[in-house]
């Protein structure tokens, strides 16, 4: 495939900006929660673009959408790319959306140049990646890859008691294809990094060898509420004081296992939350991550051991429950190498970046060779209305996606017209 082949960066940007108008917020972000009317509008727009590009569209029973460009040999499993178009309540324009529309731009570029691939090319968008309306996160790809059942997903409810199945049917995306029956030859996902590493290193492309595993916990510390004035310090059963020592240990554990140890307390509830009452109970979340599963398990064991010691030393009631776990996900060497080779061929500055966030690709990796491409986002900010990315970086990532997919899909002989380079 000629090294001069490039996508149309302006067309990609225009598509991103048009999709971002659906659910646009006053602060420049997007609120398009999964399976809402706005999600339906976004889905309809992307599906319409796919059909304009000559693609056929299939929807499965969890609402995952697969848009297919035929290959010379349609019996071959497709080379797929994709991501999601649902957002956080205060989301940005690029998280997920970039991966879907970069895939669409790959197809448009192949159409422009009359290129026929040996294997079909598919672009997917997965249902409820964000998990901001329904739990679990990455629902569509998880059901597709067998991480949990369709029945479990259907039964999930939002805060108003509406179920996933009801909402899929209501918006017209309750498909007929059985999840997981759709073959994948290889899967690539282009994404903004959602962190500051690439920008800090002044690199354009992140080659992603793996995604960190994580353990999530709910922790409750129970003491005794009492008046803040009359109760001496030595006679208190202060739940917040003890909870704080556990929170500090979360950070200490992460710092013991650099460079990929992560420890976060993101949610805290204090009861009764009164200025002059010693807290009687504290509930909080714990998030531990590492790219090495053995180290992640060590962090888990150290967390439990510290809680047990603290319970014994303080005499307070302390409960900790692991509520979610997924192991680190190393991506397939062939896909990682395809991304690396495409980046080097195109001359972009690059570095390896381990993903600290979960993506649909961690589930596709269970059923097909998978890989990811990162591009920088401004100040590393994501899941925020001010999320931003440079058009040139988005274009570069899409060019890498194009060449990596072509390397895997193959190009039929005599299938490229002269003058094949699209405008950059």
Task: Spell out what each predicted region is.
Residues 60, 116-118, 175-180, 230, ...:
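Flexible, glycine/charged-enriched surface loops at secondary-structure junctions
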Residues 12-25, 82-83, 350-400, 405-408:
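Zn-dependent metallopeptidase/amidohydrolase metal-coordination segment
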Residues 47-51, 56, 60, 66-167, ...:
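Active-site metal-coordination/substrate-binding segment of hydrolases
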Residues 128-129, 133-294:
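Midchain, well-structured core segments that form catalytic/ion-binding scaffolds
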Residues 34, 264-273, 285-291, 317-336, ...:
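A short beta-alpha structural unit
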Residues 227, 231-256, 300-305, 350, ...:
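His/Asp/Glu-rich mid-to-C-terminal helical/loop segments that flank catalytic regions of hydrolases
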Residues 19, 81, 91-130, 215-221, ...:
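Alpha-helical metal-binding/catalytic segments enriched in His/Glu/Asp
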Residues 2-36, 326, 383:
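N-terminal capping segment at the start of a domain
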């Amino acid at each position: 495939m000629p090294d001069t082949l490039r996508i149309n960066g302006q067309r990609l940007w225009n598509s991103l900006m048009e999709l971002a108008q659906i659910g646009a917020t006053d602060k420049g972000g997007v609120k398009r929660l999964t399976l809402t009317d706005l999600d339906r509008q976004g889905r309809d727009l992307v599906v319409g673009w796919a059909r304009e590009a000559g693609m056929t569209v299939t929807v499965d029973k969890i609402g995952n959408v697969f848009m297919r460009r035929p290959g010379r040999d349609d019996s071959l499993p497709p080379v797929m790319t994709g991501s999601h178009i649902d957002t956080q309540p205060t989301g940005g324009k690029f998280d997920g959306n970039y991966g879907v529309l970069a895939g669409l731009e790959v197809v448009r570029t192949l159409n422009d140049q009359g290129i026929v691939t040996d294997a079909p090319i598919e672009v997917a968008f997965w249902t409820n990646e964000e998990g901001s309306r329904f739990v679990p996160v990455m629902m569509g790809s998880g059901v597709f890859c067998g991480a949990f059942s369709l029945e479990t997903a259907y039964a999930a409810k939002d805060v108003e008691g509406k179920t996933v199945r009801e909402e899929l049917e209501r918006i017209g995306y309750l498909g007929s294809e059985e999840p997981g029956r759709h073959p994948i030859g290889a899967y690539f996902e282009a994404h903004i990094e959602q962190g500051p590493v690439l920008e800090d290193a002044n690199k354009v492309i992140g080659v992603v060898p793996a995604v960190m595993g994580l353990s999530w916990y709910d922790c409750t510390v129970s003491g005794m509420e009492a008046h803040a004035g009359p109760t001496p310090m030595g006679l208190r059963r202060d739940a917040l004081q003890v909870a704080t020592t556990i929170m500090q240990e979360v950070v200490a554990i992460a710092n013991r296992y650099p460079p990929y140890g992560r420890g976060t307390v993101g949610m805290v509830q204090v009861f009764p939350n009164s200025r002059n009452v010693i807290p009687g109970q504290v509930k909080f979340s714990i998030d531990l991550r590492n790219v090495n599963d053995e180290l992640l398990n060590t962090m888990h064991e150290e967390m439990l051991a510290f809680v047990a010691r603290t319970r014994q030393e303080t005499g307070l009631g302390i409960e900790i429950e692991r509520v979610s776990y997924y192991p680190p996900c190393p991506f397939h060497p062939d896909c990682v190498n395809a991304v690396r080779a495409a980046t080097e061929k195109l001359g972009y500055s690059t570095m390896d970046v381990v993903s600290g966030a979960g993506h649909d690709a961690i589930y596709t990796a269970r059923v097909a060779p998978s890989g990811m491409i990162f591009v920088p986002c401004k100040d590393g900010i994501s899941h925020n209305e001010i999320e931003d990315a440079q058009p040139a970086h988005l274009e570069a990532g899409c060019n890498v996606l194009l060449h990596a997919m072509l390397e895997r899909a193959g190009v039929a002989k005599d299938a490229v017209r002269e003058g094949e380079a699209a405008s950059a």
